[in-house]
């Protein structure tokens, strides 16, 4: 089992409520990221040195591919969200649609702390998992 980690999970990884499970998944090579998440994490770097250290850390994780079919699937899900409940498509960020599509197409589980993935999973039926129960962080 591989988790497609969302930025929300990454930023909570050091919290005591998350750390044990995160480290277990990391040591089992169960953590992967797509390039969208990589860009978001690297955006948060505070210096060039911090950027390079983060990039090195991210290089050790499994890469979840993002290609044209990922964007096609993200568009399909966005359309379904628009049709299920008027303007519901506007409640899910574009990045989250792409990350969810990458996870779905690669057969990985979105690991997150973000309710947007519940909305997407209601449409796709794909597996997602909160890093800790919703509302506990």
From Swiss-Prot:
Tell me the domain of life.
Answer: Bacteria
Enzyme class (EC, first level): hydrolase
As recorded in UniProt, its EC number(s) are 3.1.-.-
Q: Write out the residues that bind Mg(2+).
A: 6, 96
Q: Which residues form the PINc domain?
A: 4-126
Task: Kindly list the residue ranges recorded as spanning the membrane.
Answer: none
As cofactor, the record names: Mg(2+)
Q: Which UniProt keywords are present, listed alphabetically?
A: Hydrolase, Magnesium, Metal-binding, Nuclease, Toxin-antitoxin system
Which Pfam families does UniProt cross-reference here?
Answer: PIN
Cite the Gene3D superfamilies for this sequence: 5'-nuclease
Q: Which residues form a coiled coil?
A: none
Keyword match Metal-binding = yes
What job does the chain carry out? Answer: Toxic component of a type II toxin-antitoxin (TA) system. An RNase. The cognate antitoxin is VapB18.
Which family, according to UniProt? Belongs to the PINc/VapC protein family.
Name under which the protein is recorded: Ribonuclease VapC18
Q: Give the organism, scientific name.
A: Mycobacterium tuberculosis (strain ATCC 25618 / H37Rv)
């Amino acid at each position: 089992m591989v988790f497609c980690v969302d930025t929300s999970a990454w930023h909570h990884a050091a919290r005591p409520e998350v750390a044990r499970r995160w480290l277990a998944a990391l040591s089992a090579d169960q953590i992967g990221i797509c390039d969208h998440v990589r860009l978001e994490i690297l955006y948060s770097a505070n210096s060039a040195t911090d950027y390079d250290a983060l990039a090195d850390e991210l290089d050790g994780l499994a890469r979840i591919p993002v290609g044209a079919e990922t964007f096609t699937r993200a568009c399909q899900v966005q359309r379904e969200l628009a049709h299920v409940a008027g303007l519901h498509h506007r409640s899910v960020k574009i990045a989250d649609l792409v990350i969810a599509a990458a996870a779905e197409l690669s057969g990985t589980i979105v690991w997150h702390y973000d309710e947007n993935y519940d909305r997407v999973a209601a449409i796709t039926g794909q597996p997602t998992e909160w890093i800790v129960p919703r509302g506990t962080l």
